[in-house]
Amino acid sequence: MSPIPTPPAGWRAAAERSVIRGRRIDRLIPWFLLDSPISRVGYWYGCTVGWVWGSLWSVGRVEQREGLWVFRGMPRWTFPRGGSCVGGCFLTGDGAVTPALLRHEAVHKRQWQRYGFLMPLLYLFAGRDPLRNRFEIEAGLEDGNYVPRGTA
């Protein structure tokens, strides 16, 4: 995925507001659903879904890097944007899997561990715009290749 060449004016302030809004939402979630045995079940379910989907469609190398199972060579229609983290599985195409990108995806893995079954729903509510999606912002917009280096 190519970064947004020139992020729109005011994007940093909007990103900060998105993170703050996300933290407010977190306070509404019952404590026993976050970083708990329940969320771990959701994380492992996500890992299972990621493994099955990756195993079905990956024609590239499958390797473990930085605590993630990386499924390469996925057809473009099987994942959004430049790749997708489902549980502890990073599903991607033929693009470069850099240390920065793995750092970004490792944060998503940690988010899956924290939120479990809630992760897909919360991510959906956060929206498709990475500059306003609190999960992408927390994972690092530069590392995720959403904005050019030096702009975040």
What role is predicted for each listed range?
Residues A100-W112:
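Active-site recognition of the HExxH zinc-binding catalytic motif
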Residues L141-A152:
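Short helix/loop segments within enzyme catalytic domains
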Residues W112-L141:
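Post-HEXXH active-site segment of zinc metalloproteases
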Residues M1-C47:
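N-terminal low-structure segments adjacent to metalloprotease catalytic domains
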Residues W69-A96:
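Active-site scaffold of zinc-dependent metalloenzymes
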Residues V41, P99, L131, F135:
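Hydrophobic (often cysteine-bearing) scaffold residues that line and stabilize catalytic clefts
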Residues R27-Q64, Q113-L124:
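A transmembrane-helix-recognition feature enriched in membrane-embedded lipid enzymes
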